[in-house]
């Protein structure tokens, strides 16, 4: 006699659940993504809560408190001007995260516009891509250094310089996806139905380019934080009186032996932030990129 399978032996498929929920579940199954998300949340919370968990005065100096080592009174010690490093590192997180996120979002938006325009309007493809190739011929950090030095040490200059350096990468990613999508049957059907270019782009092309663009955005976010720290270290990035991780490291390089903590803590903050965002980007790439997807 044939035995009937127990109802508990069947697993109900995820019917009716939105793609966003299913994607979030797949992401949360990945340990590296969870670690990156937790680390990034810690950095973001520290930056947001900085006015309440520090003395709120990142530029307050005290000759009497110069070169104080880490302790209960000053968790990260003080620098050569007697400024509290715990306060400066947390306020520096606000600047670095804001610049990194702004650069990533602007690069993604402008890169998407250029990439889709090049793929859809083929008469502009050669011109736009040659400009992107010319920008990509220079290492991103060297291009950013040149633009930032020409514009002067301002926050807006840093954002313009870094955005200019990373737009080509986003544009090429979007163009590659859009070139494939424009030849699909449903895009041809939309053309035959009389849909306008704008409608096809916004309804069929752009939404299907978002996955690779989002992955690229996360990596640009991490690269922008590192690049901003580099520019500030060289003195052409975030200007005083804004606290910046790169400028704090630069101020501590002359005291790396006797006051090692000046360089150590902002360096750790840069490393943790870049690592966290890269771990998140790796998880997004594995889940969202069809070429690397290994699980349904």
Swiss-Prot record:
Transmembrane segments: 35-55, 97-117, 131-151, 205-225, 229-249, 260-280
InterPro entries assigned: BP-dependent_transpt_permease, MetI-like, MetI-like_sf, OppC_N
Keyword set includes Transport: yes
Domain ABC transmembrane type-1: 97-281
Keywords noted in UniProt: Cell inner membrane, Cell membrane, Membrane, Transmembrane, Transmembrane helix, Transport
Gene3D superfamilies: MetI-like
Superkingdom of this protein's organism: Bacteria
Membrane topology: Multi-pass membrane protein
SUPFAM superfamilies the UniProt entry points to: MetI-like
One family name in Pfam for this protein: BPD_transp_1
Major place of residence: membrane
GO BP, sorted A to Z: transmembrane transport
Places the protein is found: Cell inner membrane
A GO CC term attached to the entry: plasma membrane
Function summary: Probably part of an ABC transporter complex that could be involved in peptide import. Probably responsible for the translocation of the substrate across the membrane.
Subunit note: The complex is composed of two ATP-binding proteins (BRA1094), two transmembrane proteins (BRA1092 and BRA1093) and a solute-binding protein (BRA1090).
Family: Belongs to the binding-protein-dependent transport system permease family.
Name the UniProt record assigns to this protein: Putative peptide transport system permease protein BRA1093/BS1330_II1085
Source species of the chain: Brucella suis biovar 1 (strain 1330)
Lineage, top ranks: Bacteria, Pseudomonadati, Pseudomonadota, Alphaproteobacteria, Hyphomicrobiales
